[in-house]
Regions:
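A post-motif C-terminal structural segment
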Residues: 1-260
Length: 260
């Protein structure tokens, strides 16, 4: 079964109403203004849904008409609420749009959301007691995302490769410049200018082959990196992922986690 509305159910159940019936004292919110006005000390359950489907990319968040809090904002408010529980708490925070940015071959969006994820981690560190709070940071998989060439120090990470000792663009054997960042597969090169929603790439055909990037601004939000193999969507990779931890028991967590 399918529905023309994203996130709509086809069995006629309204889970929001069901939740409100179970928790009549609970607070349901779906926009920034309600989020900002939350009473974090009431102890009432909170159910927050800010989008029909996925949250927006961090770079695209300002285009949400109803307003959408950032990952770090949600982390801070959630910790304030959970901290009222004398028995402690478990909180899982996921920055899922990093994954989606990579699938779209949009390093700009993937890295912008990674920066916001870093802010959320720092928010968790700043708003918890290190003596009794274990914080673990990891990933569930990697992506076929590479750093290529030998760009000189200071070269923009989203830019085209300029080799050490020169001011000229480095070029492949095909005579075309290339970016520091690229993907093994995916929809490949697209230039959408200042577009901040990486998912726009799925409304076009995957790009085949190389593109002449000489006069393309590869640092713009709407630039999608080249891919060696054209696919509708970039794939996950197979390398182990890093695991970081701080707090009680952190000494038991180190190194990498094997992907399954």
């Amino acid at each position: 079964a399918s529905s023309p509305i994203e996130g709509d159910r086809t069995d006629n159940r309204n889970l929001i109403e069901e939740w409100q019936a179970i928790y009549p004292e609970g607070v349901y919110i779906d926009r920034q203004q309600q989020f900002d006005g939350l009473d974090k000390t009431s102890g009432a359950p909170v159910f927050a849904l800010f989008n029909e489907s996925h949250m927006l990319y961090e770079a695209d968040r300002g285009n949400d008409i109803g307003g959408e809090p950032s990952l770090s904002e949600m982390t801070e408010v959630t910790l304030d609420i959970l901290d009222n529980n004398p028995k402690g708490y478990f909180l899982l925070v996921e920055s899922g749009r990093i994954d989606h940015g990579h699938h779209a071959n949009s390093a700009f969006n993937a890295l912008t959301d990674t920066i916001e994820f870093s802010r959320a981690i720092q928010t968790a560190v700043d708003n918890s007691n290190p003596d009794n709070t274990l914080i673990i940071v990891t990933a569930d998989h990697g992506h076929v995302f590479t750093i290529a060439g030998y760009p000189k120090r200071g070269n923009p990470i989203l830019g085209k490769v300029v080799d050490v000792g020169t001011s000229e663009l480095a070029k492949g054997l095909d005579g075309l410049p290339y970016t520091t960042l690229s993907y093994a597969n995916g929809p490949g090169f697209h230039d959408f200018g200042n577009e901040t929603n990486a998912d726009k790439v799925y409304y076009t055909k995957p790009f085949m082959g190389r593109a002449d990037l000489t006069h393309i601004d590869t640092r713009s939000s709407g630039f999608h990196q080249e891919a060696m193999i054209a696919k509708r969507s970039e794939s996950h990779s197979g390398e182990d992922v890093a695991v970081y931890a701080t707090g009680p028991g952190a000494h038991l967590v180190s190194g990498t986690q094997e992907q399954s």
